[in-house]
Amino acid sequence: AQASKGYIDPLVGRVEEVERVCQVLARRRKNNPLLVGEAGVGKTAIAEGLAKMIVEEKVTDILRNSVVYALDLGDLLAGTKYRGDFEKRFKGVLAELREKEGAILFIDEIHTIIGAGAASGGVMDASNLLKPLLTSGKIRCIGSTTFQEYRGIFEKDRALSRRFQKIDVSEPTVEETVGILKGLKSRFEEHHKLKFTQAALKAAAELSARHINDRFLPDKAIDIIDEAGAYQQLQPPSKRKKVVGVGDVEAIVAKMARIPPKSVSASDKEQLKGL
C-alpha cells in the first residue's frame, strides 16, 4: 500500500542483493531470505525496494502478483493481558497470510520474534509458531537483522536459522553511495525546497566516510544531506540559500563530527607536508 502511494524512496544499486532475494523467494521450500548487515547499510531499503518493484511490475512473472506485508510486533503485543492472547493474534495473522496468494511477510529486526510473547518459563514464542509454516514454504518471509544479533540471538535457534537463507548486505563504497544520493536527490530537494549540487553529494559521501566513524554508509551520508537541507530551512528567508554546495556540507560534517570546519576538507597530503 505504501509503495503504490509513492511513500517509499527508490532503491538505487543493490542489484546483486535484490536478485538473490528474488531467487530465494522463488524456491519451493525454505524460501525465506534473511538480510544480514550492519545498522544503516540499507537492509530495510532492500525489502521496501522489492515492494516498490513489485508494484511497478519490474520483477519476474513468479513474483508479479506478490504483496509484501510488514509485521509490527509492537501492535501484536500491545494489550495482551492473558496467556494465549498474543498467540491467538499471531496465529490469526499467519492464517490470514496463508490464504492470501503471493503474500510475503517482512519482519524487520527479526531477532525480536525469539522470545516474543513467551510467558515466564514458557517455550511457545512467536518464532515457534512461525517455524512449521516456514519449512513448508506456505508463507514466504523476509527477515533483517545485524551481524551482532544474528550471531548472539538468531543463530542460537538452529531450527529457525536453517529455515532462512542468509544474504550478507555489505556497506556500499563511496562511489556507490554517491550514486544512491543522486537517486534520492529529487526527494530531498522536494522536501527542503532547494537544490543540491553534484559536488555537495560527492562531498557528503566522502566526508562522512572519513570523519563519522561510528556509523555506516549510505545512512550517514543521507543524514548529512538531509541535515544540510534542514539547516537552510531554519534560516530566515533573506539568508536562505536556494542551492546547497560543498561549503554547507562541510559545515554540517564539522558540527556532527565535532571537528573544526577548517580541518574537514583538508587533505592528508597537505597535513603530511607540514610534518
For the regions a protein language model found, what residue spans apply to each?
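AAA+ P-loop NTPase nucleotide-binding core of proteostasis motors
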Residues: 1-275
